Amino acid sequence: MIQKFSKLNKILLFVPLMSLMFCFNSPQNDNDKMHIIMINVKNALSFHYAPKPINDAYSEEVYNNYFESIDPTKKYFLQSDMDEFAKHRNLLDDYLNKGDLIFYKQTIDRLYERVDEIDKMTQDIFSKPINLDENEEFILEPKLKNHPANKKELYDEWKKYIKYNILQEIETMTSKEEAQKEKRDSVIAHRLKDTINVKTLSLEEKKNKATEEIKELISHTFKRFKKRKKMDWFSVYMNAYTEVFDPHTNYFSPKDKEDFDTNFAGKVIGIGAQIQEKKGHLYMGPLVVGAPAWKSKQISEGDKILKVKAKPNKEHTNVVGMLVDEAVRLIRGEKNTEVVLTLQKKDGSIKEVKLIREEVSIEDTFARSIVINSPNGEKFGYIYLPSFNADFENPNGRNASDDVKAEILKLKAKNIKGIILDVRSNGGGALTEVVDIMGLFIKNGPVVQVKDGSGKIDILRNRSNTPIWDGPLLIMQSEFSASASEILAGAVKDYQRGVVLGSPHSYGKGTVQTFIEFNRFMRTSDDFGSLKLTIQKFYRINGKSTQLKGVDADIPMKGLFTYAEIGEKYKENALPWDQIPTANFSSSYSLNLQKLLNNSQKRLANDNIYQLLQESALWREKLDKEEKIALNLTKFMELMKNRKEHIKKFKLLSKYDNQLKFTLHSDEENRTKKDTAFKQKSESWIKNLRKDIYLKEAINVISEIK
């Protein structure tokens, strides 16, 4: 969760850093820049909620973190490399204090050296027949692996990795053939007029085709890797330091911060088109209706991008072979400025298109609602909230609380009986937004408590005296509901304002972060990136932290990820759980939660689909924990055959229909007639909602709330 500081708080936070930051001159090169970043990160970390001593023990944790990030599967560095690097194991604290790059440069130089060697090795592997009849195994669990002792072992490891990928590709082809045959047989059985031609390849043909595809994939992977600048890895190095403090304290490069801000605010200044990469070339992806690319009527999905002229006084930049994120940053820019694209159309013709950049909304960031018509004729409102977004730079920009309010008002006009607010997979967002959203459902009162590192506790209150919805309310959560989502679910529980349904507990992130932008205090135009720093913990108004434990559902429903290791409690260096005194609050709401729970448990115990879902989840988790797999073609295909036999019993899950009826709002219905992309997105959304067994139970539960 991100906290937006007031101007005063920002000044108080940064004053101790100013004297140090201002002493730097403009960097002459990347080494100077990285040195400055290291010093600033080190000083900023002292303001962490729970600062750690920068000593040898810290250095060892950083060391382990770094290699866990840079070579997690142990298929790049040799054991001799690791022995050489180990000399620095207890020196990384000193390097941070001095801004010394010796260890970073040594490891990254060696990484690029090994990648060059491995690239040549893989080319040699593909130049010879690949034998899939040998009785070998590939280790899937990285913790069971050792770094290769020498280059022969490195070669053998990559050969096994290639075999594993070829076998997977063969299985993918086989599964596609089987699906096509099944579809064809269904057409014949039902005497339909459709004709389905199934092209069947022999096993040898599949092997040859799979080998070529994996060869191309690996070759392209190395080409992309080599295009990355060595400084691009510096964020990984810095985060090895920061994440020892806690998992949510992270260094953001300027590019990473730009992407974060774009997603958080739900907007971007650009042309309104996705850029996609295929075989080293960049192509136009889907266009946003109403955005510059779409309005030009000169650009189509699938056009190949050859050049970009980012500014009128700049030359055209050839983007063939360029990384997607680099091309995207050429195309993006300031509002109302010109960008020129040179495109190759599908017919081979070359076209130059001039566009004026505009603010383009990323609609997937925003709340959306729909009316659900239940089998008994009652109507309920469903609001999907993907994030607690906010535009901190623009006071008139979109934010989650205003969007949710607008959706509630639209639903109220439909005379709905209750509201389901879905924050499954919502990872959080702005602290202010969750407080304001709670104010849509309750009168003036505390929503959440925050405590800083000194122990000072603040209570954040909703100031609204006029909630706009006082009817039945249900919150849907999952294992991925985190931070602000947990504040909302916790407050709804504490006030007994509504029911929380979903995964037995949420993610368990109970910390608050803010951004320190280093370049704001530097006498240079260079951008040094930002540090996202944990500065507070938050607590429910009952005094309990959500850290590690999350929020328990009133109506627990297990799902596909219930048995997986998902949540803050599985993260290294996560801050501990604790609690503080209860805030002074009262509630006029009352729910018979035990009755609702008993009724739900009876329904779920007799729901064959729900029980089958639990069996599927346990089986999938068992697969995920497999540590090795055979690389012999016959054994591999037999294993896949057995798995598919087991999967057959789960096919009912894909055919499930909750029998709920969904009605779009009239403005959205009208939009589907003009906007093909929006129509397809809406149809897909409704299709997925109809397959949602949790939503069906949510309707059952909210129907019983009196």
Model-derived features: where do they sit?
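Bacterial N-terminal signal peptides that target proteins for export
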Residues: I2-L12
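Polar, glycine-rich mid-to-C-terminal structural blocks
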Residues: A484, Q496, L501-I566
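Acidic/histidine-rich, surface-exposed loop or edge segments in extracytoplasmic proteins
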Residues: I37-Y49, K87-L91, E216-H220, P386-N389, ...
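PDZ/PDZ-like domain segments forming the peptide/carboxylate-binding groove
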Residues: E68-S69, Y104, D109-K120, I130-S175, ...
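Conserved functional hotspot residues or short segments at active or partner-binding sites
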Residues: I125, L140, L144, D156, ...
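Cleft-lining beta-strand/loop regions that shape enzyme active-site pockets
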Residues: F24-N29, L45-N55, S59, K223-K230, ...
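Bacterial Sec-dependent signal peptides at the C-terminal "C-region" and cleavage site
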Residues: N9-K10, P16-D32
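Extended, small/polar residue-biased N-terminal targeting/export presequences
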Residues: I54-E60, F67-P142, F222-E277, E338-V340, ...
